[in-house]
Regions:
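Mobile cap/lid helix-loop segments that gate and shape the active-site cleft of serine hydrolases
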Residues: 3-52
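C-terminal catalytic histidine-bearing segment of alpha/beta-hydrolase fold enzymes
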Residues: 59-140
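A general structural motif
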Residues: 54-58
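Alpha/beta-hydrolase-fold catalytic nucleophile elbow
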Residues: 1-4, 62-64
Length: 140
């Protein structure tokens, strides 16, 4: 895990490790087998191919990809960002024939209600379009 050099990134990494330790009694580094079984996907193909269970499921991942903001504000490169494995997940699903697997990329759309820039904000999703997509999936 690369937390970066920003305080918010370090605190986020600590919170995640603590949550995993509490929930599963170990971290992924300490007991990778638990996380292999729990994870729907891993970049490391040695940890199974759990994405196979999603090959017939409509899947979307949404990401506000602003590399310069990440570097400047969080001290983080793209290497450890969640859009890297998400894009590989979508790629693998499409290679399996899943035409309903989509990587939804936005740029500089993530803002909290108070105006604070944050790439994990719900504002990265076009709500109306997403609802229409969900309804289309249900009707299928």
């Amino acid at each position: 895990m690369e937390p970066g050099n920003a305080t918010v990134s370090i605190e986020e990494a600590k919170l995640l490790q603590s949550s995993l330790q509490t929930a599963y009694g170990s971290t992924p580094a300490e007991n990778p087998a638990i996380y292999r079984d729990l994870s729907p996907f891993s970049l490391d193909e040695r940890f199974g191919n759990n994405e196979q269970w999603l090959k017939d499921v409509a899947v979307r991942t949404y990401h506000d990809i602003d590399v310069n903001w990440r570097i400047k504000e969080r001290g983080q490169s793209v290497f450890y960002r969640n859009y890297v494995p998400s894009s590989e997940l979508i790629n693998r699903l499409q290679k399996m024939g899943n035409e309903r697997a989509e990587f939804m990329q936005t740029y500089q759309t993530g803002y909290r209600l108070n105006g604070q820039r944050h790439p994990h904000s719900w504002s990265i999703i076009d709500a109306e379009e997403c609802v229409q997509w969900i309804l289309g999936v249900w009707e299928r």
